[in-house]
C-alpha cells in the first residue's frame, strides 16, 4: 500500500484564495496555528482508515475557523482533494453534502466517527 498523501498549508492557502475569487468572501487567515493543527490532525496516527482521516480533516477545518471567511468551503474542498489524492472520491449530491456539513458537522457538532461513517457511505474509488 502506498503512503497517504496530504495537502500542504501552501496548497490550502492557494485553494482558499481560489474559492474566494470564485464564490466571494472576505480574504484573510485568522490563525495559522489552527490551520496547521487541522492539517496535521489526520496524520496523528490515531485514525486508522482514510475515511477517519478525512473526517478528522473535515471536522477540524470546518470548526477551527482558521480563515476570516470560507471555512466550510475550504473544509469540504480540501477533504475532497485529500480523498482524490489517495484514490477515492465522495459521491454525494451537492445539496446532501451541504446539508450534512452545515446541519451535522457545524450545528450538531457530529463526532469524528459520525463524520467518518457518512464519508465511508459516500466514498468511491477513482478509476
Predicted regions and their residues:
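FIC/Doc superfamily catalytic core
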Residues: 1-127
Amino acid at each position: 500500500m502506498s503512503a497517504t498523501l496530504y495537502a500542504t498549508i501552501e496548497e490550502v492557502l492557494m485553494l482558499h484564495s481560489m474559492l474566494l475569487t470564485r464564490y466571494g468572501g472576505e480574504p484573510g487567515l485568522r490563525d495559522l496555528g489552527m490551520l496547521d493543527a487541522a492539517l496535521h490532525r489526520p496524520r496523528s496516527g490515531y485514525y486508522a482508515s482514510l475515511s477517519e482521516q478525512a473526517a478528522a480533516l473535515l471536522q477540524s477545518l470546518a470548526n477551527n475557523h482558521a480563515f476570516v471567511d470560507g471555512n466550510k468551503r475550504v473544509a469540504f474542498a480540501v477533504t475532497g482533494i485529500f480523498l482524490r489524492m489517495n484514490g477515492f472520491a465522495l459521491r454525494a449530491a451537492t445539496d446532501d453534502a451541504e446539508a450534512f456539513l452545515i446541519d451535522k458537522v457545524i450545528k450538531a457538532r457530529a463526532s469524528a466517527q459520525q463524520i467518518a461513517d457518512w464519508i465511508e457511505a459516500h466514498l468511491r474509488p477513482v478509476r
